[in-house]
Amino acid sequence: MRREPVGVVGSIAPWNYPLQMAAWKILPAVAAGNTIVLKPAELTPLTSLLFAQAATDAGIPDGVINIVTGTGKEAGEHLVGHPDVAMTSFTGSTAVGKRVAEIATATVKRIHLELGGKAPFVVFDDADLDAAVNGAVAGALINTGQDCTAATRAYVQRPLYEAFVQKTAALMETVRLGDPFAAGTDLGPLISHVQRDRVAAFVDRARAYARVVTGGEAPEGELAKGAYYRPTLVADAAQDSEIVQSELFGPVLVVLPFDSDDEGIALANDTPYGLAASAWSRDVYRANRATREIKAGCVWVNDHIPIISEMPHGGYKASGFGKDMSSYSFEEYTQIKHVMFDNTGVARKDWHRTIFGDR
């Protein structure tokens, strides 16, 4: 058995972690012996260009790492559909991922998709409440919520529900918005005003069927001109509501109660996504059951969102397929060849009787 490079890899990276995502795609592809053409998001192209320049300065030969900037419609679709590209690796929304798969299928190329998420945060009634509250706020607000593994749906067993809502809202209200380069800032702006307005629209529509406990607005004053949005907690939404089912990509956490363990796990699985999840319990057997039954590519216990480079990252269901990081990512960028040598020197093999009989 031999693993060989696939050839030319065409990759498309998102804007939310421009350096990290570029590295996740470039490094395993090149380490496996491929060349790569990377298209960064049009909102964040400079990081990838600087990365490629640093690679050249370090001695990587010209033509191994290539950066192509442009829009998804023009540069991205052309890259995915090009017949000389042997594999496509895409990180981004599920909607765009479906389009990538459609284009790639026309040339029957390999596809690696890391798509959207709607990570559940399941708190059982024996959990450490303070730890869960801190984990929920940090997990929901990481990168201003612009993270496909961010905690977005907190399911809290009913005995802890109201206390969790109150404590989480209180902690969110202590988070300081401001310039990301300022020492006292906890939370910066979203990527753009378009994204801020999209998040705000989700929350505004939710007011008709749910309770906005805290946040739900852009700040006033000196931050009003930026793409800022206050940390937001939404409670009492229905499971089938838009804000529970759709990926927002902003600093918004929705909290819902559940009664039995069966119900909590069922609710956690009840979206199209399956990228990441967390379960909170002092009972290792209870938590381990959750890790088995929650359909997600990563399930943390008593923590949310630690990403470890030695462990694989990738999803189930509409969150895509294939793995980033770890040795599994290396395998994504190779193809398996079966090689067989016959050194017996025998001209007519035993199996040749299927043609020649006993002659």
Language model feature labels by segment:
Residues 87, 95-238, 301, 348-349, ...:
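ALDH superfamily catalytic-core signature
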Residues 85, 122, 176, 228-359:
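Conserved C-terminal structural/oligomerization subdomain of aldehyde/semialdehyde dehydrogenase
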Residues 1-131, 258:
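Rossmann-like NAD(P) dinucleotide-binding subdomain of oxidoreductase/dehydrogenase enzymes
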Residues 62, 115-116, 147-149, 183-185, ...:
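Short glycine-enriched loop/turn motifs at secondary-structure junctions
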Residues 12, 68-71, 91, 139, ...:
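Conserved residues at the C-terminal ends of beta-strands
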Residues 29, 104, 168, 206-207, ...:
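A generic structural signal for well-ordered alpha-helical segments
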Residues 30, 37, 66, 112, ...:
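Structural detector of well-ordered beta-strand residues that form the stable sheet scaffold
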